[in-house]
């Protein structure tokens, strides 16, 4: 169901509570990476242009429901001011007198950033009274925080019970691009799934089996699938309680005639640390005391060949311990291959985005999702609470 967006309503002179995802990394009291802030700028600028009063609310870090100096929003307000080229007033709190008085002094086109919403334990409990206090600051609620749309929190879902709620421009873009993957992808459609844990991704793979032509599995999670096929994986990361599910998934892929590709060779070492001896072995020769830490050159060849035929690719999760150069080749090869494709390429998840950035090809992707967990749940076919709460068109 298509959701109403900020373009579908009149916001002139209105107080607009805009939920953004400003959960950015900090270093020495400065914003270390401002990508998430930049992603919100189009919606903020649209609202300023429409002469709305823009009240921003976000969380930052995990302050555990109490005030924590390290997670105050002041550095974010400073960086946002620079990006917008105008003053952003930082309120002393997100509810109560400090928030109310900051909002009361606003003129049309002004921007106020409320203090970290997670300084209050009620936020993550989706407390109704707290949601009402947030809602009382505004006339309209706009959710532009796709990254937290899978959380039913007061500032993502609760507040929508008290105000007309619509999607921001970033939220709209995410829902449109990810939605198209599930409903009308250009074929052949391939999914590349990696990362360390099968448990995080099983639901996604099962759902994607009904949509895709090819599934490529790498990273630590591939070990569980290799074990399910009878291979010994040495000391590699393994989720023994998921082996039966992996078997089921392999059978399901076969019955749906989806091509399922697993590594045929791996880079092994005694452990995930640099400077150790390492070698490449076929998957049936992983030494008993060693770990598989990346896909090998034959797997890279197999995977990239399959991807070259694709017209749509969704990628979530690295192929190995890509943070360490000796084990980054598989992930970087996938990133470079996607960058060269004449296809729709969508990346979900923080690690995968970081890997594309490390390979220097982030700008060549069609779309890098701003929501790791949210994009996974969306691709799993789940309804996201923060999206469900918005008005339908």
UniProtKB/Swiss-Prot annotation:
The keyword Metal-binding does not apply. It comes from the Bacteria. It comes from Pelotomaculum thermopropionicum (strain DSM 13744 / JCM 10971 / SI). ATP binds at residues 201, 323, 349-352. It is found in: Cytoplasm. GO terms for cellular component: cytosol. Its main location: cytoplasm. Monomer. Keywords: ATP-binding, Cytoplasm, Glycolysis, Kinase, Nucleotide-binding, Transferase. One of its GO terms (biological process) is glycolytic process. SUPFAM superfamilies: Phosphoglycerate kinase (SSF53748). It catalyses: (2R)-3-phosphoglycerate + ATP = (2R)-3-phospho-glyceroyl phosphate + ADP. GO terms for molecular function: ADP binding; ATP binding; phosphoglycerate kinase activity. It holds the Pfam family PGK. Belongs to the phosphoglycerate kinase family. This is Phosphoglycerate kinase. CDD domains: Phosphoglycerate_kinase. InterPro entries: Phosphoglycerate_kinase, Phosphoglycerate_kinase_CS, Phosphoglycerate_kinase_N, Phosphoglycerate_kinase_sf. Pathway: Carbohydrate degradation; glycolysis; pyruvate from D-glyceraldehyde 3-phosphate: step 2/5. Its EC number is 2.7.2.3. Substrate binds at residues 21-23, 59-62, 118, 151.
């Amino acid at each position: 169901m298509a959701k109403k967006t900020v373009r579908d309503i009149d916001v002139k002179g209105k107080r607009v509570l805009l939920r953004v995802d400003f959960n950015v990394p900090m270093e020495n009291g400065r914003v270390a990476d401002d990508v998430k802030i930049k992603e919100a700028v189009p919606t903020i600028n649209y609202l300023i242009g429409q002469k709305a009063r823009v009240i921003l609310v976000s969380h930052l870090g995990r302050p555990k429901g109490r005030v924590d100096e390290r997670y105050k929003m002041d550095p974010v307000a400073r960086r946002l001011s620079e990006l917008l080229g105008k003053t952003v007033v930082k309120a002393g709190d997100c509810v109560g007198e400090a928030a109310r008085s900051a909002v009361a002094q606003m003129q049309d086109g002004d921007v106020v950033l409320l203090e970290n919403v997670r300084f209050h334990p009620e936020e993550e409990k989706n407390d109704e009274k707290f949601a009402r206090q947030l809602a009382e600051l505004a006339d309209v609620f706009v959710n532009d925080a796709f990254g937290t749309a899978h959380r039913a929190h007061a500032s993502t879902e609760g507040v929508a019970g008290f105000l007309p709620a619509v999607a921001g421009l970033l939220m709209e873009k995410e829902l449109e691009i990810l939605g198209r993957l599930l409903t009308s992808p250009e074929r052949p459609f391939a999914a590349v799934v990696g990362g360390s844990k099968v448990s995080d991704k099983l639901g996604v793979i099962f759902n994607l089996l009904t949509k895709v032509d090819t599934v490529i599995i790498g990273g630590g999670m591939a070990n569980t699938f290799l074990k399910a096929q009878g291979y010994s994986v040495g000391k590699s990361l393994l989720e023994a309680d998921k082996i039966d599910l992996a078997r089921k998934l392999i059978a399901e892929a076969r019955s749906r005639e989806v091509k399922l590709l697993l590594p045929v060779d791996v880079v092994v070492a005694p452990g995930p640390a640099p400077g150790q001896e390492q070698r490449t072995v076929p998957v049936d020769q992983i030494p008993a005391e060693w770990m598989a830490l990346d896909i090998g050159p034959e797997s890279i060849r197999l995977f990239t060949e399959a991807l070259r035929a694709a017209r749509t690719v969704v990628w979530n999760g690295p192929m190995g311990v890509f943070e360490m150069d000796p084990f980054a080749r598989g992930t970087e090869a996938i990133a470079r291959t996607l960058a060269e494709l004449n296809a729709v390429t969508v990346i979900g998840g923080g690690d995968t985005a970081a890997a594309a950035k490390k390979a220097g090809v982030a700008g060549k992707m069609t779309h890098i999702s701003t929501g790791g967990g949210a994009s996974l749940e969306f691709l799993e076919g789940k309804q996201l609470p923060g999206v469900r709460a918005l008005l339908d068109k």
